[in-house]
């Protein structure tokens, strides 16, 4: 699968490469302090907004990207955002969407994601499908962010709940939306920005148009962005020359009894018809062909009783239908290409505000984003293979009209329905078996903002104060359609079971999940100084009234026919009365009373959170910088639902940092911080599809998960650039996981019986350690005769699990550390023309393979692996360039995987892991997870 074209990076090379990251380095750390203060005087506010040290002194584990960085890196989606940031990965949800980020060995709800300080939706699934066919109800995805609306992104690696609240165990990703000033050029009162981009790997086309103004105290902006794309295509070599041969079942009319020469076979007479018809039989039935029909043909030949032309035609029709299918057309578990997907999104961002008194601002914001991922699951076999003949056995083979294929069907394994039990329910052989998955997201936010701004170190009560209220609703709608209503080989997503299509069938397994947040935040900043010290104090308050609503909705439809024998006609011929086809509608909703997750009624949890935080970033003299902060959170969850957890959680988090600067070129930093995560809404709802719990039984209480982060770093800076090397250690305690726990419950007679209860438990403690390197070399600063603007960048991250301990009374069903990203190096060489007219860059990436030992876990006494395979090492090279024309037009282009290497990333292969929301564990061909081959992106930006 993997062709090794890697480059070697040694410790010597790292040392020589010294001092790198253009994307992570702070402008203020690249030059002397004196020159720094002079060059940043006019952009103090903006620099503070995007600085790595804006919240704590060390900057360790921080990555800050501006909208300019996103444009330069040609970020067209969530998978592009962290392309060159080792240690930060995207969690693939399995159905085209994503489940958030993976940082420091944890992922999903353990990495906080926020926009303008408002938390985004949690990843939510129901453990078990509603329709009984396997899989999971619910999306498991979070809403993705529209990057054209974003001004800055702060990625915080390591526990950080004192800044980001619940969920920041492994880290946090905080987005800030654009302001009017981001669209307006200096010296103007209005501005228009337009952008069009295309990415070939998923054929995504994006167009965005934004306008902003600032006049007489009023300012505002409006941005509209639309995207349309397809599934990400794997390497082109994957499907070259691949062809599948299949043998499928069909129907034939048994006109002759081949065992005897010229003997007619079984015929029947339908009520209302005059002529008898041959019974329909299954073509391709291996047992029948081997033990009867084909054997009889050979016996006839031996007995010199040749078949006549009609008999030979019937024998041919009785054989399996052989087809040769391309890689694009093939359906089944061995499919080598990914499922076809249609992706669309649309987003609005609007802001309007008024400045008055020189220091005050009042404004409002409106966001509305829709995303849809419409997929056809091509691992669902469209045809019925010869290995499925048994399910069509014992069918009468009678039919109405001339389509003899209507005589063959099978009874699906579905829930019993209320109604007439004499109705024959079945799925016809002649219909294509198809499965579609529709994943739709909607996010809407409305907010009000008051901001007070003053000069730093003023005599006023605050340098800055912000009061905001946001009302946000985020919903995911996941619908799985199973259709058997289009005649093979046709595929029709709009078809449904109907009376004119006997034994047609459709089912809908739908799940809605919605979170609502009403968030009130207040923050106050004040800078103080005296002869020896400088302080920057930040005091924060917040209140969040939240609600989680889950609603399953599963409907099934089946076109049924009453079929009953009425005896014989005058010629002793079977005679059937065939009732008219009718559509029988059935619903699992609420039918099985013990399975509460199948009741199609909203299930609600109300939540509230109050927090207060205080942070001080201060310096003593010129040698020491410090940061110290703490936060107090109190969360309440209440519900009227049976067997849903509720409770109060009080959590405290903190952070501290110290920087020692013996000279202006070198510093030593130490950072310590903590994090917590209260149980997610999914964990509060729990699992209740396996047992008939006795009345009064309560789920075991869950504690908040905890995290501790320790980092030490060495930093060099100067005219030559910047280098940071850090070592970190993270410890996680009381991690929540799905597990089996032996519990004694009374049976129907009242006697205690020990059974395994599968649910969420505080099950694990674990620790890991690692190394992180960031840097940038400015070659003109190293040697003055080299061109100004020539640079080299480096990023490296390695994480190694140290220990995992499980509760001895639990049998775990998942392993937490499959989220650890393999070690990765990213080395870049580039040039930016000093006046910004043009630039070019090459990025080299090398990743080690996934360690299989990190995938092993114990389920009881059995050793298991969360995936069947681990990724191998891989390397790739990307080239990008930009050209500015007359300051208003920028053309950007990039070629990725320029060497056209074939490889599989661990993030993609992890979709087969047990922890994936929509797992593809049944795949027998892993080519579908291969990374794209050589691909490109183009972008055209216009500013007026």
Curated annotation (Swiss-Prot):
It is a multi-pass membrane protein. It holds the Pfam family TonB_dep_Rec_b-barrel. GO terms for molecular function: ferric iron transmembrane transporter activity; siderophore uptake transmembrane transporter activity. A motif (TonB C-terminal box) lies at residues 927-944. PROSITE patterns: TONB_DEPENDENT_REC_2 (PS01156), TONB_DEPENDENT_REC_3 (PS52016). Residues 52-178 form the TBDR plug domain. Keywords: Cell outer membrane, Ion transport, Iron, Iron transport, Membrane, Receptor, Signal, TonB box, Transmembrane, Transmembrane beta strand, Transport. The keyword Oxidoreductase does not apply. It is found in: Cell outer membrane. Residues 189-944 form the TBDR beta-barrel domain. GO terms for cellular component: cell outer membrane. Residues 1-27 form the signal peptide. The keyword Transmembrane applies. It comes from the Bacteria. InterPro entries: Plug_dom, Plug_dom_sf, TonB-dep_rcpt-like, TonB-dep_rcpt_b-brl, TonB_Hb/transfer/lactofer_rcpt, TonB_lacto/transferrin_rcpt, TonB_rcpt_b-brl_sf, TonB_rcpt_CS. Unknown. May be an iron-siderophore receptor. Belongs to the TonB-dependent receptor family. This is Lactoferrin-binding protein A.
